[in-house]
């Protein structure tokens, strides 16, 4: 499970929504009373606009973040076009959400902010101070959170809820993990170009996609820049990243990709197109490295041996008191105290009689806040107080192991992997269709803006 850490989450929200939360500015509002232009339009998106100021602000934020991370900053014209394209997609989605009547009330936003704070082991007031210290006004951050929730709810309604995974797909997935590639333990770093051509498309459309794919394959094999080819032509969700998957375990890749990569050396492009049920793929192996996988033939789940001390809030115990008490206990344990004895004495959970020991926990068996904190700990490490719906926890990880789990758990893991892959592709297709049916006019003077 992804860990919600302060820096990445705050930066993500600030980048994603600080420019979406501004309501579309009507053209007649862009001039001052004296006729002097105070802002100009970068793009018209249906019945709204993206202003040059919004675009420049987002570019400034992204540039600052890249500089802080010592990451290369793309040429300004290239960055501007990429940022504007993303803003157009986001604006179209927000307009669609409004049409669908999707709204996020204040209570939901507040609960989300509280969960973000709790995930970082902070009170909401301290969390707010940290955000504002990064130069992001709290009103902007709150608006950004509302935007992210809106887009998430829209995707759930329009895409994720419609993705289905059949039992046959699950069986085939598990069988593929038991096939000739099941023993591979090398993580694979790939690049790919995807051209959509589902099996139920017309023969004309399939042939056109195949011709284009063959032409791109010839360019890639001839030494053309693969990243540029992917950015310009791929219809996959990662096209903007040059089709770069990063290092991925073979179990999380389509079996066709793994089979192709097994015969390639780093830097080589698969000599043939890969035909999938969704279209045509061109695959290039960037590199491989020793992975974390095993040669076992079944999907794995990571179980965690964990114990905790729970203090419930209420009945004379306030939140500050609970946090302070657990911090005191943590300090005493660090000084040589026995965790199990403290759990037996203080914990208000049923596990107190076992010294707080919960045994081996599988993913999804605890509340999200507990699981996120648990997953962030190293073996033997003790957390700071963690807030959940039950109160405050002091958590210690005792060990981890891989387990095949039950047949039902294996099937659930397979269903999740397939569903996630299908949802990402369905979302990319839906976004593309949404973009194709929208009226978008990019102002011609944009390219001359510095």
UniProtKB/Swiss-Prot annotation:
Record's signal peptide: 1-27
Protein name: Chaperone SurA
EC number: 5.2.1.8
Keyword Chaperone attached: yes
GO molecular function term, any single one: unfolded protein binding
Biological process annotations from GO: Gram-negative-bacterium-type cell outer membrane assembly; protein folding; protein stabilization
UniProt GO cellular component terms: outer membrane-bounded periplasmic space
